[in-house]
Design a protein with these regions (language model features):
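A recurrent flexible, glycine/aromatic-enriched loop bordering the glycosyltransferase active site
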Residues: 21, 29, 79-109, 122
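Glycine-rich, basic loop-to-helix element that forms the pyrophosphate-binding segment
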Residues: 14-31
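Conserved donor NDP-sugar-binding/catalytic core segment of glycosyltransferases
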Residues: 48-80, 155
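Non-catalytic membrane-proximal stalk/linker segments that position and tether the catalytic domains
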Residues: 85-86, 90, 156-194
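A short, conserved alpha-helix in the catalytic core of glycosyltransferases
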Residues: 110, 120-148
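Short aromatic/hydrophobic "clamp" motif used to bind/position activated sugar donors
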Residues: 36
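Acidic donor-binding segment of Leloir-type glycosyltransferases
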Residues: 1-13
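The conserved acidic donor/metal-binding loop of glycosyltransferases
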Residues: 40-44, 69
Length: 194
C-alpha cells in the first residue's frame, strides 16, 4: 500500500476501543492538516475526491465546510447503487434527516472552536458534529460538491444495509437535533417520527 510511504498519513493502533466518537477523536488529535475529513474505515472514495475538495478550497479560501454526494457499494466493491444526490446546504432539511452524512470535511479552526465528536451521541456522533460545525461556519461558508465521491459500503451490520441494525442511532439522532435547537435558542421538542 503506497499510503504507508506517505509521511502525511499516520497509522496508529489504540490501546483500547474508545467507542465510535472516541476512536475518531484520537485520529483528529494526531492530525496536522488544516482540514479534517470524516471517513469510515470500510468505505471508499473516488480517486479524485481529495483533489476536488482541495481545488475548491484553493479557489474559495473562506469555505469552512464541504460535503459531497454519495452512493452505496456492495460488500465486495463490485456494484454501486442508490446514489444520494444532496441539495446545497439546507438547515431545515438537516433538522429532519442527516442528509450530509458522508463525505464531510471541516476546517481545523472550526473543530478547535466546537470541540471533538461527543461520545454521548454515539450512533449519530457525526450528525451532532455536523450540526455544531455548520452552526459555527454559517451557511455562506458551507459548500456542496454535486458528485458522488464517497461510496458507503453495505454489509449485514451496517446502517447502510439495515438502518434498524443500530436502533440506538435513531435515539442519538433525535438527541442531536434537540441539542442543535437548544444551542441556537429554538424552543422545540424533538420526537421520533411514526
Amino acid at each position: 500500500n503506497h499510503s504507508y510511504s506517505d509521511s502525511r498519513i499516520k497509522i496508529t493502533r489504540l490501546d483500547k476501543n474508545y467507542g465510535i466518537a472516541g476512536n475518531m477523536n484520537e485520529a483528529i488529535k494526531i492530525s496536522t492538516g488544516d482540514y479534517i475529513a470524516l471517513y469510515d474505515h470500510d468505505d471508499t472514495l473516488e480517486p479524485q475526491t481529495l483533489f476536488e475538495f482541495v481545488q475548491l478550497l484553493n479557489e474559495n479560501p473562506n469555505i469552512q465546510v464541504i460535503y459531497s454526494d454519495e452512493d452505496k457499494i456492495n460488500e465486495d466493491g463490485s456494484t454501486y447503487f442508490q446514489p444520494h444526490f444532496k441539495p446545497d446546504f439546507n438547515i431545515d432539511l438537516l433538522c429532519s434527516v442527516n442528509y450530509i452524512c458522508h463525505f464531510f470535511m471541516v476546517s481545523k479552526t472550526i473543530v478547535n472552536e466546537v470541540g471533538l465528536l461527543d461520545s454521548a451521541f454515539d450512533g449519530a456522533q457525526d450528525y451532532d458534529f455536523i450540526f455544531r460545525c455548520t452552526e459555527r461556519a454559517g451557511s455562506e461558508n458551507i459548500y456542496h460538491i454535486p458528485h458522488a465521491l464517497y461510496h458507503w459500503r453495505m454489509h449485514q451490520a451496517s446502517t447502510a444495509e439495515n438502518p434498524e441494525s443500530k436502533m440506538y442511532a435513531f435515539d442519538a439522532g433525535t438527541r442531536a437535533i434537540q441539542a442543535h435547537y437548544d444551542r441556537v435558542g429554538i424552543h422545540a421538542t424533538v420526537e421520533k417520527g411514526k
